[in-house]
Amino acid sequence: MRNRFGLKMAMLWSVLTLSAAVAPALVSAADKLPHFLSPKDADTYRQIFALQEDGEIKAAAMLIKTLDSDLLMGHVLSQKYLHPTAWRSSFKDLSVWLSRYNDHPSASRIKWLSDKRKPKGAKSAKAPKQGYLNGVGLSRPQSYRANIPESWKGRSAPRRTANIAKEIRRAIRRGHPSGALDIINNKSNLRYLTASEEAHLRGEIAHAYFIFGVDDKAVRAARQAIAKDTEQAFMGYWAGGLASWRAERFELAGSFFRTLAEMENAPDVLRAGAAFWAHRVAMRFGQPLQADSYMNIAATYPETFYGVMAVQAAGQRYEIDFSLPAITDDFRVWLAAQKGGQRALALLQVGNWTRAARELRYLVEEMPPAFQRDLIAFATRNHMPGLAFRLADLHQRDTGEQIYAALYPLLSEKTDFVVDEALVLAIIRKESGFYPLARSRARAAGLMQLMPATAAFIAQDRRYRRTHKHKLHDPTLNLHLGQKYIGHLLAEPHINGDLVRMLAAYNGGPGNLNKWLRKLDHKDDSFLLIESIPARETRNYIKGVLSYLFIYRNQLGQPMPSLLDLVAGQKADRRLASSQ
């Protein structure tokens, strides 16, 4: 997507309001979405879910007796059986549930628990229905690493080549670029590498030397990479330019950056970055025309971090269409005819968007392909951003079509933002892909991926470390604590409103940020700080969030002063600390 820029930006954001009606009457001529719960039952289910979430199982049981429809009882019981503190489920409870509701989205979790509770010699519970769509939408990478071996075909020992690359990268990860250099200089290893593969790996070693602050060795390794293959040593040019800039050898930096910026075969993220830094070099030498030419190259890659910065520096608006596909009558009829679709529509009546989205994930595999765009639009309009993002990402991979309103979804209009909305959305997109039930290996939970210890500190409530940690999957609570944590970080003396530093602390931890600020020679330059951070995940995180911030501010019609400040080499706009 490299079309030029204009002032026009279309944004069509319509919300389908689901008003209650006796099942299954139509909502309205415009929506044509059937309801399967009466107003009384919708309200009762809403109360039941809330009571059970708080552990009030007996009070919820009294309300269950007043229901006319049992359409959502599978969800009610799964919430009860999976509650972490208020109920201990027996194998019989779980087995009976699976015999009735194995097509529900909680079936896999119930099955796992039933296997743990199964008495010796007892028959296993019924298996969950297959076909559930797992996963979240994936973010565009903001870094580059070559595939080695470049090809497995026609090679004498491709496995050996892969192992050499693995050993070199392991040495780099462990902080030993010189050890990596020893591996690649071993003649018995070199014979398994093509010239371009050697150039790629030597470029990675050069970048490692830059990361560890050894700029002279970084430049030397960069030159060795370029000598092996001038057309493929992308990381060599990149690392050589960064190391030369930090060493204040600006003419040499310009040579590295300009060469990479003019390589049409270079990866987008590196070409955009090199062009942006070539612009900075030219401005330092008082060459505005040359600077503009390189800024224009960077701006042709608006989905990269440096492309975003270039667009902002040039005062351009990237033309983005935020309209959604129309939802067809055929899709509405099909959805209402599916048992899972009926439950999803009922859950939308209740206002339980997370459970509704999970029901729809079971329908994706059996849905006619012609309805793919319908479901994307339906999920986007009905407050299911995680599902919308996941489906739009898959759709983009399959067809190349970018449905931006789903790739960059919004939250409910009822969401309470106390920090800049675009910033919060950008962080959520990067952290969890808008999936409220997301949980990392490190135990970070929910939309904003909060650690239990962080939540306990921010809320001043130790229960979030243990008995209340499951509550972090509640979107409202997670957003509240996450925004409070952002405000806390921005107020820290060593961050002092700096957006780049705040993002580094949010991802890498405040302690690591303190260490990086002490040890890194970043010369109070935001871009150099980003590139110098040792943790690749944190570098990519900052670049990703700032790129998404650009698109969300565009979508919301907000100004972008913080990005312009970054381009000018200043600190980020501190007005992001409060909602605008």
Language model features with spans:
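N-terminal secretory signal peptides that target proteins for export/translocation
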Residues: 1-7
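Solenoidal tandem-repeat scaffolds enriched in leucines and small polar residues
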Residues: 152-200, 204-205
